[in-house]
């Protein structure tokens, strides 16, 4: 099992924290275990409350069913169903940008 460094950032929220996330753990779950309060709703990849935007690195979010190909191509990620596949930086609280 690999462990990656995931940096979660959001200037408006005053968030800039790096956490270690195993490659079989969803980023949202690891953030909560680290004491971070990120937005979420369904926890099943079927809404956009937990949306973030990848600034660097890669994730596996094949369990999600909400984002379309264009949104994924633009770097959007649903943190509740995203596993890290490399060290990555994700800007959080991006739901409003999807619409």
Swiss-Prot record:
Record InterPro entries: 2Fe-2S_ferredoxin-like_sf (IPR036010), 2Fe-2S_ferredoxin-type (IPR001041), 2Fe2S_fd_BS (IPR006058), Beta-grasp_dom_sf (IPR012675), Fd_pln (IPR010241)
Annotated residues for binding of [2Fe-2S] cluster: 42, 47, 50, 80
A single GO BP: electron transport chain
Taxonomic superkingdom: Bacteria
The record's free-text note on cofactor binding: Binds 1 [2Fe-2S] cluster.
Cofactor(s) it depends on: [2Fe-2S] cluster
One function term, GO molecular function aspect: metal ion binding
Domain 2Fe-2S ferredoxin-type: 4-96
Matching Pfam families: Fer2 (PF00111)
Record keywords: 2Fe-2S, Electron transport, Iron, Iron-sulfur, Metal-binding, Transport
Free-text function comment from the UniProt entry: Ferredoxins are iron-sulfur proteins that transfer electrons in a wide variety of metabolic reactions.
Similarity comment text for this entry: Belongs to the 2Fe2S plant-type ferredoxin family.
Protein name: Ferredoxin
Organism annotation: Chlorogloeopsis fritschii
């Amino acid at each position: 099992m690999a462990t990656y460094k995931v940096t979660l950032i959001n200037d408006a929220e005053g968030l800039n924290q790096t956490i270690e996330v195993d490659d079989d753990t969803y980023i949202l779950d690891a953030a909560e275990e680290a004491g971070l309060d990120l937005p979420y709703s369904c926890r099943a990849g079927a809404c956009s409350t937990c949306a973030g935007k990848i600034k660097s690195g890669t994730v596996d979010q094949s369990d999600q069913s909400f984002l379309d190909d264009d949104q994924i191509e633009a770097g959007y990620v649903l943190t509740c169903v995203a596993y890290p596949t490399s060290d990555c930086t994700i800007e959080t609280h991006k739901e409003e940008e999807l619409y």
